[in-house]
Amino acid sequence: MPRYRGPFRKRGPLPFRYVMLLSVVFFILSTTVSLWMINGSIKPVLMDIGEMETKRIATEVIQDSIEDYMSDSENMKDMFQMNSDENGNLTTIDFNTQVVNSVKTKVTKQLQAHLKEMETHTGHSGASENIMINIPLGQVTGNSLLGNLGPKIPVRFNLIGDAFTDVKTKIKPYGINNALIDISIFVEIKVKVIIPFASKTAVVTNNVPVSIKAVQGEVPQFYNGSGGSGVTPSVQLPSSKENGADSKKEKSSK
């Protein structure tokens, strides 16, 4: 026999504790998804801005370090010594390794000092305070029209740097038996910009000339300027002794 069902009873509203629990769960999920979307959209913008700011600060560190060293450094002529023969003709050029290593050490110390100021934010012009960037929330949309809308989110950058230096010498020949000596300091700075849950390293290099000198050697009596692979003709010139003997003969004959 079919069972008789009584009248359908409508259920009442959910208890308050269930409503509160569902609201909290929904709020946590929606907040997590929103933060994940915002972070994914803003992170590339933050890293690009941080890299540009890092390169700017690293360039200032190099310039200030070289300027501080050049203002207090010893005479750059001591970096190389030119040796001549008894006739005053240039024979060899010797580089003073002690002075070269001293230059490298002093510049490295200057760079490390400025990088330390940059990391601790105590005194370097351009890094006197933490780098703070305010990104509009409209950057999340990726739309140029809406990019400047919404509240601005402050993001703080931290910087960590390391420096490498080397003294390079180049000798470039020019003219006839002439040379141009170029002594420069190669500087490489690696600065890592750190934001919450992300980091990126920027490398800045610079080659700073510290001493340039033109050296003129003895002009040869014969010069093959063609540079070809042909046979070089042999030209024999009378020596000074032979010229003196010939002149004496001419005087005696007269």
From Swiss-Prot:
Residues 243-254 have a biased composition (Basic and acidic residues). The chain crosses the membrane at residues 18-38. One of its GO terms (cellular component) is plasma membrane. GO terms for biological process: sporulation resulting in formation of a cellular spore. Keywords: Cell membrane, Membrane, Sporulation, Transmembrane, Transmembrane helix. Residues 226-254 are annotated as: Disordered. The keyword DNA-binding does not apply. It holds the Pfam family Spore_YunB. The keyword Membrane applies. InterPro entries: Sporulation_prot_YunB. Residues 231-242 have a biased composition (Polar residues). Its main location: membrane. It is a single-pass membrane protein. It is found in: Cell membrane. Induction: Expression controlled by a sigma-E-regulated promoter which needs the sigma-E factor for the binding of the RNA polymerase and subsequent transcription. NCBIfam families: spo_yunB. Required for sporulation. This is Sporulation protein YunB. It comes from Bacillus subtilis (strain 168). The lineage of its organism: Bacteria, Bacillati, Bacillota, Bacilli, Bacillales. The gene is yunB.
